Amino acid sequence: MDIEAYFERIGYQSSRNKLDLEELTEILQHQIRAIPFENLNIHCGESMELNLEVIFDQVVRKKRGGWCLQVNHLLYWALTKMGFEATMLGGYVFNTPANKYSSGMIHLLVQVTLSGKDYIVDAGFGRSYQMWEPLELTSGKDQPQVPAIFRLTEENGTWYLDQIRREQYVPNQEFVNSDLLEKNKYRKIYSFTLEPRTIEDFESINTYLQTSPASLFTSKSFCSLQTLEGVHCLVGSTLTYRRFSYKDNIDLVEFKSLTEEEIEDVLKTIFGVSLERKLVPKHGDRFFTI
């Protein structure tokens, strides 16, 4: 696995190699704008693998994306290879309908230490919940970014990531009540501890998430990619584009229903994804917002 191939995949050309916050931010932003957050393998009859060689082949060579356990694993590898002091952490995702965090550790994120200061880096949450910059590991501090205001809070050794969102405007009246729209202005995202993890810690949950009928990931096919101004999402056959702050403190959210032929074209043109197997788009009843 070649770090230069990874840099080429994310379009990163700087040779600064200063291992500072600016470079860390650039790596994160290049990755989230080049590598989609997606689970399409599941809906093409293929598996979601955790092996780094397989992930590298899928994401870097075949120009696909992946879910958090894959794209953040790749990010962790790249940062470590560059010389950053990085640690894998495990997260518990907030389930809005149940109003509680997941019982299983279903999210992988990365902690990076720079000159004695800790940051959270995550390229694998996608949609409008995706951070665009590393977050200072500081409790109770509002950290405004382009997508929203993020806030980390620590309580008895557990950290909580929340988001304060803008109002949203949906011009197409057909979709104003879409189940894909986030209704909460204050949104809990996930919790985590600072206990170091290895990829092996996620093996059983990786299998569960792609096989269980109760899993969000078997319920919906999705692909999400950040841009310079917002984020594209394809859920089932519904395409959305959210433009952050198109007006003062308001996001613009555009919807479009696609035909089967349009889906294949959109995956290639918007997300840069060419599938080897036929996708069966799915929009099941599990809660999932963009």
Swiss-Prot record:
It comes from the Eukaryota. It catalyses: an arylamine + acetyl-CoA = an N-acetylarylamine + CoA; an N-hydroxyarylamine + acetyl-CoA = an N-acetoxyarylamine + CoA. Its EC number is 2.3.1.5, 2.3.1.118. Disulfide bonds: none annotated. Pfam families: Acetyltransf_2. Substrate binds at residues 106-107. CoA binds at residues 103-104, 208. It is found in: Cytoplasm. It is an enzyme of class 2 (transferase). Its main location: cytoplasm. Belongs to the arylamine N-acetyltransferase family. Catalyzes the N- or O-acetylation of various arylamine and heterocyclic amine substrates. Participates in the detoxification of a plethora of hydrazine and arylamine drugs. This is Arylamine N-acetyltransferase 2. It comes from Rattus norvegicus (Rat).
